[in-house]
């Protein structure tokens, strides 16, 4: 790996490590997303805590965290594998941020950015899948899980296995991070889109 590739990967991780949910909640003088609602510093929890405007800002920045480094990697290296690895590093930064004690979000919004940066078709597959599941079920977590699996595995049909591998790893990591959501979905205790935030409890 040359210096350029290494620098891009480090940049992707560091940019991913900037947790917009925590910063946005601080700026809007809202409770910390790590202490209320689901306890997850992500867009859905910010929506429950502060409403549409803070959530929209969080979503946009989280998407850009994935989009920007992937586009940079694509333009500067022209290497699909390095670009896919850049996507992985951006996700790792979001989920395990060095600036916030390695305790971050679940990576879904950042994944959207990486998918659009890698291939707009993959990004579109994710968004359409998410919207369809969300409209039918009103579960943000279920929508994210289904869209993540479908979009990530779709890479196999557009690239070789080596290039697809980083996205498959991303899918596995995001599924593991949603373990609690999966358990609550099974038990019927998962919050739906539009539910108000409550103080963090044992179920989160």
UniProtKB/Swiss-Prot annotation:
It is found in: Cell inner membrane. Its main location: membrane. Coiled coil: none annotated. GO terms for molecular function: acyl-phosphate glycerol-3-phosphate acyltransferase activity. SMART domains: G3P_acyltransf. GO terms for cellular component: plasma membrane. It catalyses: an acyl phosphate + sn-glycerol 3-phosphate = a 1-acyl-sn-glycero-3-phosphate + phosphate. Disulfide bonds: none annotated. The keyword Cytoplasm does not apply. The keyword Lipid metabolism applies. Catalyzes the transfer of an acyl group from acyl-phosphate (acyl-PO(4)) to glycerol-3-phosphate (G3P) to form lysophosphatidic acid (LPA). This enzyme utilizes acyl-phosphate as fatty acyl donor, but not acyl-CoA or acyl-ACP. Belongs to the PlsY family. NCBIfam families: glycerol-3-phosphate 1-O-acyltransferase PlsY (TIGR00023). This is Glycerol-3-phosphate acyltransferase.
